[in-house]
Amino acid sequence: MSVEWFDRESLDRTIQDRIQKTDVVLDVGCGIRPQAFFVPKLHVLCEPYAEYLRILQNRYAQRSNVLILQSRWMEALRALPDRAVDSVFLVDVIEHLEKEEGTRLVAECERLARKQILIFTPLGFMPQDYASGERDGWGLTGIEWQVHKSGWTPDDFDASWRIVGALCRAMADDGLVDHAYDRNRTLVYGLANRAQIRTRVIEYYLRWPTGQAKGGQVDRPDYFS
């Protein structure tokens, strides 16, 4: 497993450059903000919460390339055959699951993805709780889906993963500001190219670009502190 550290701006550019623009994408637990790195020919959105789902249905009502499923991840993914999609995205998902369940989810993604998996998650456990009756970061009622239950570090991923991370001071994303991001945090992307993992791991990593983006790399943080 390889780990690189960047400033936030360089991290976003690096991930955008490394993601493969594939035809069929499974976007698990997307909430109201599905991945927007590229537009696939078929974008399958898997979202369990009804209020989020209605927003997605209204937003993509005229988009023939978007298929929306109301389902928890386990039921949806286990119904699919091996290598059913090109890419799987887990954007701010696994930290909302207990560690054992999150590990099972990642394993299912590895079974399904033909080409790549992308995971975006805070580095380590970052507490995020809500009081009864409080609204979530989108001003909606999905607080039970927004509680953090686990933390993840590069050591949770094997050698098939390319890990890149960035140190961030708070987090703001198009007007979405989560109250839990109130001090320095580290965010991590995990990217696995499934097409070569099993047979060409060593060669694959030797051939991977260095990731030296404009602005340069930053020092690796001590994520156990």
Describe the role of every protein-language-model region.
Residues 1-19:
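Class I SAM-dependent methyltransferase Rossmann-like catalytic core
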Residues 3-5, 74-78, 98-225:
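S-adenosyl-L-methionine-dependent methyltransferase catalytic module, highlighting the catalytic core
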Residues 16-129:
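Conserved SAM-binding loop
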